[in-house]
Amino acid sequence: MTISEKKHTVGRLKSRPQFLAVREGEKRRGGFFLLEVLDRKEPDSQARVGFTVTKKHGNAVERNRMRRRLKEAVRLHAGFAMQPGHDYVVVARRDVLDASFQELAAELKSRVETRPKHRRSGDGRPRNV
């Protein structure tokens, strides 16, 4: 790699306040996970990612396996698509264990690349008049 080439790396979310801040952002639902995204309004800083697997999804061995699969999918396929200055939290669902790695990586990449939908001034639901 030459000096002019920029290595695109993804940082990590480590503390509870960082994870809680991302919960206030956009949520992108998928079959294998929920992706929470927060724009930090700092375009010069690198993207950061964190992983959450709740205890209802099995014992520690299974939860760690889910986390490892998601980390590897981000490293190989989705990390380059993450926008600088954004924080991402991947909340795993049980189906992460049963999905093929190609399906998992494709869905993760798709969710990361999805752009937010702009809503009209209303909440989008019809009113009863």
From Swiss-Prot:
Q: Does the keyword tRNA processing apply?
A: yes
Q: Which Gene3D superfamilies match?
A: 3.30.230.10
**UniProt-annotated stretches for the region Disordered:** 109-129
Question: Keywords on this record?
Answer: Endonuclease, Hydrolase, Nuclease, RNA-binding, tRNA processing
User: Looking at the UniProt record for this protein, which Gene Ontology cellular component terms does it annotate, in alphabetical order?
Assistant: ribonuclease P complex
UniProt catalytic activity = Endonucleolytic cleavage of RNA, removing 5'-extranucleotides from tRNA precursor
Q: Which PANTHER family match?
A: RIBONUCLEASE P PROTEIN COMPONENT
Q: Which family does it belong to?
A: Belongs to the RnpA family.
Q: Please give the subunit comment from the record.
A: Consists of a catalytic RNA component (M1 or rnpB) and a protein subunit.
Q: What does this protein do?
A: RNaseP catalyzes the removal of the 5'-leader sequence from pre-tRNA to produce the mature 5'-terminus. It can also cleave other RNA substrates such as 4.5S RNA. The protein component plays an auxiliary but essential role in vivo by binding to the 5'-leader sequence and broadening the substrate specificity of the ribozyme.
Instruction: Quote the protein name from its UniProt record.
Output: Ribonuclease P protein component
Organism in which the protein naturally occurs: Rhizobium johnstonii (strain DSM 114642 / LMG 32736 / 3841) (Rhizobium leguminosarum bv. viciae)
* This protein's encoding gene: rnpA
